[in-house]
Amino acid sequence: MTPTANLLLPAPPFVPISDVRRLQLPPRVRHQPRPCWKGVEWGSIQTRMVSSFVAVGSRTRRRNVICASLFGVGAPEALVIGVVALLVFGPKGLAEVARNLGKTLRAFQPTIRELQDVSREFRSTLEREIGIDEVSQSTNYRPTTMNNNQQPAADPNVKPEPAPYTSEELMKVTEEQIAASAAAAWNPQQPATSQQQEEAPTTPRSEDAPTSGGSDGPAAPARAVSDSDPNQVNKSQKAEGER
């Protein structure tokens, strides 16, 4: 800047240092006394607190409101688009544009339906394939579990170890032993009777021995009869020769 221009400009106003300090330094916060919880002051504080809570609740409600939208376009955006369309096309142009849009949508309705049907069929086929894969995996997984649960075959050469007796089997064995001992104590003649029954069938055989035909049996008297009657023997021989 030229010196003439500096001379023409007005001089800045004089500001004292105290005013500058006041402007720079923030005001000191004084400690306010605690409110008295008596009388009207309590009511005023209560109303203030309630109003603050209501304001906070209204803010949160406003934030949580979900705005409906069509193809990602909300209500205010649609209004703005409508106003711009009115300014650009005018009322008559908007009516014609709406008619053309309706005609195009009606013309594309069958194609849209076909696309929807194709998408549904594709989805159903995908679900079926996924379900078939899941079923096959489950069926393949079951035999593995069965094979894991199967026990190894026992070797024929190895003798099986006797299974430990259970408490019920031990009780049965003890009861049987007690019953047998009691029967033997009360009936001591049972072994003698059993021995007699075993010896009984052997005695008839000794009685039937002479009748079966031995050296000293009934064959001896037959021989005596044949020796005592030689005439009868001759007659029988003659009769056989005549025949």
From Swiss-Prot:
In thylakoid membranes, TATC and TATB form a large receptor complex, containing about eight TATC-TATB pairs, which binds the precursor protein. Twin arginine signal peptide promotes pH-triggered docking of TATA oligomers to TATC-TATB receptor complex, inducing a conformational switch of TATA that results in activation of the translocase. TATA dissociates from TATC-TATB upon completion of translocation. The gene is TATB. Part of the twin-arginine translocation (Tat) system that transports large folded proteins containing a characteristic twin-arginine motif in their signal peptide across the thylakoid membrane. Involved in delta pH-dependent protein transport required for chloroplast development, especially thylakoid membrane formation. TATC and TATB mediate precursor recognition, whereas TATA facilitates translocation. The chain crosses the membrane at residues 70-90. Disruption phenotype: Seedling lethality. Non-photosynthetic mutants possess near normal pigment levels but lack one or more elements of the electron transport activity in chloroplasts. Defects in protein targeting across chloroplast thylakoid membrane. InterPro entries: TatA/B/E (IPR003369), TatA/E (IPR006312). This is Sec-independent protein translocase protein TATB, chloroplastic. Residues 135-152, 187-204 have a biased composition (Polar residues). Residues 68-69 are lumenal. It is a single-pass membrane protein. Residues 1-67 form a transit peptide. It comes from Zea mays (Maize). GO terms for cellular component: chloroplast thylakoid membrane.
